[in-house]
């Protein structure tokens, strides 16, 4: 249906159909992220020997995150007197919009994908980098030293880990022969790339955690050093924009790892009768659990250690993996 609409002449009907689909995607993702945050808090509570949210919405705290969202929407929207007002207002939008744009190319099943484009992997990596511009803009516009330091840290971290992230997936592109995410999943029908590209998987996972600014790489928001980092001066719904973009990317990156390394919706051998959507959900949940486990387990590292590890360790390993993959493909495939 979508392909037919894309090839048909432009009309107001097409506009309203795509606008409706975009709104549907927005609310579906926001609803999922809302309860995804609750799930993370519950898992962290379990790992730390706590109960977690249990006051709003019954003993399981099912409405806790909904209450948090309502609280943020009702809080006063304050803008510092010394801030650059236009940029201060624009920054959360710049950070927030790309987070939803990247989800359009993720194939959740062979039949459920919003946009099947030939360069889906390249599109995801390119668009996700725009968020850093919003983060740096927010830090600059706040006219606060802690916010500015947080924004500068975010930019330095993104530059340092974007390169290993891209290099780690070149091996997959060589093996699959495509940048299309659907074709990459189809190429893993017999064997998942986590077994063929274990080094690439480890490099991608570490670089992804750094890209997401999550522990142990959460230097842009380091509460013990920078109050709250680049969004120190933000409150209410503007702060919620930054928070939601972080969590949408969190779940988006988990989906991308599932597609690139875990075979997407492809089933385990002899269990093909289970629907592909179930397999995708199970793999996705495992990646999310692993990333939450990282957050609970590891302490924050120093800035110099972060930079040194990215440039001196991850990048050479990623380059060596490309060379080795090309050699194996040339000799055996």
Swiss-Prot record:
Q: Which GO terms describe its cellular component?
A: plasma membrane
Q: What is its membrane topology?
A: Multi-pass membrane protein
Instruction: State the Gene Ontology BP annotations.
Output: aerobic respiration
**HAMAP family xref list:** NDH1_NuoH
Which keywords annotate this record?
A: Cell membrane, Membrane, NAD, Quinone, Translocase, Transmembrane, Transmembrane helix, Ubiquinone
Q: Which reaction does it catalyse?
A: a quinone + NADH + 5 H(+)(in) = a quinol + NAD(+) + 4 H(+)(out)
Keyword Membrane listed: yes
Kindly report, in one word, the top-level EC class recorded for this enzyme.
translocase
Under InterPro entries, the record lists: NADH_UbQ_OxRdtase_su1/FPO, NADH_UbQ_OxRdtase_su1_CS
GO molecular function terms listed in the Swiss-Prot or TrEMBL record: NADH dehydrogenase activity; oxidoreductase activity, acting on NAD(P)H, quinone or similar compound as acceptor; quinone binding
Looking up PROSITE patterns in the UniProt record yields: COMPLEX1_ND1_2
Q: Where, per UniProt, does this protein localize?
A: Cell membrane
Q: Which residues cross the membrane?
A: 15-35, 88-108, 117-137, 159-179, 191-211, 239-259, 274-296, 313-333
UniProt-listed NCBIfam families: PRK06076.1-2 (NF004741)
What is the primary gene name for this protein? Answer: nuoH
For this protein, the Enzyme Commission number is 7.1.1.-
Function according to Swiss-Prot or TrEMBL = NDH-1 shuttles electrons from NADH, via FMN and iron-sulfur (Fe-S) centers, to quinones in the respiratory chain. The immediate electron acceptor for the enzyme in this species is believed to be ubiquinone. Couples the redox reaction to proton translocation (for every two electrons transferred, four hydrogen ions are translocated across the cytoplasmic membrane), and thus conserves the redox energy in a proton gradient. This subunit may bind ubiquinone.
Give the record's family classification: Belongs to the complex I subunit 1 family.
Q: What is this protein called?
A: NADH-quinone oxidoreductase subunit H
Q: Name one Pfam family in it.
A: NADHdh
Q: How does it assemble?
A: NDH-1 is composed of 14 different subunits. Subunits NuoA, H, J, K, L, M, N constitute the membrane sector of the complex.
- Signal peptide positions are none
What does UniProt list as this organism's lineage? Bacteria, Bacillati, Bacillota, Bacilli, Bacillales
């Amino acid at each position: 249906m979508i392909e037919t609409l894309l090839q048909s002449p432009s009309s107001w009907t097409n506009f309203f159909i795509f606008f409706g689909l975009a709104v549907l995607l927005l609310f579906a993702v926001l609803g999922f992220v809302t309860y995804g945050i609750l799930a993370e808090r519950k898992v962290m509570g379990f790992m730390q020997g706590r109960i977690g949210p249990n006051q709003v919405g019954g003993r399981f705290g099912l409405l806790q995150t909904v209450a948090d969202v309502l609280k943020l929407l009702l809080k006063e929207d304050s803008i510092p007197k010394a801030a650059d007002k236009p940029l201060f207002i624009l920054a959360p939008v710049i950070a927030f919009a790309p987070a939803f744009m990247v989800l359009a190319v993720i194939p959740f099943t062979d039949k459920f994908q919003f946009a099947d484009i030939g360069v889906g992997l390249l599109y995801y990596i390119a668009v996700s980098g725009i968020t850093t511009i919003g983060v740096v803009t927010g830090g600059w516009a706040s006219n606060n030293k802690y916010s500015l330091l947080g924004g500068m840290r975010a930019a330095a971290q993104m530059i340092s880990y974007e390169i290993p992230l891209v290099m780690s997936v070149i091996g997959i592109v060589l093996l699959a022969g495509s940048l299309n995410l659907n074709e990459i999943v189809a190429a893993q029908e017999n064997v998942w790339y986590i077994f063929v590209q274990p080094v690439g998987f480890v490099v991608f996972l570490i670089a992804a955690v750094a890209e997401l600014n999550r522990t142990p790489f959460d230097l842009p928001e380091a509460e013990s050093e920078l109050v709250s980092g680049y969004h120190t001066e933000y409150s209410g719904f503007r702060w919620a924009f930054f928070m939601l973009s972080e969590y949408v990317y969190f779940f988006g990156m988990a989906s991308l790892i599932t597609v690139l390394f875990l075979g997407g919706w492809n089933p385990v051998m002899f269990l093909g009768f289970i629907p592909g959507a179930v397999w995708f959900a199970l793999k996705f949940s495992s990646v999310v659990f692993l990333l939450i486990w990282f957050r609970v387990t590891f302490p924050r590292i120093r800035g110099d250690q972060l930079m040194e590890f990215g440039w001196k360790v991850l990048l050479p390993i990623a380059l060596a993996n490309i060379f080795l993959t090309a050699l194996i493909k040339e000799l055996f495939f």
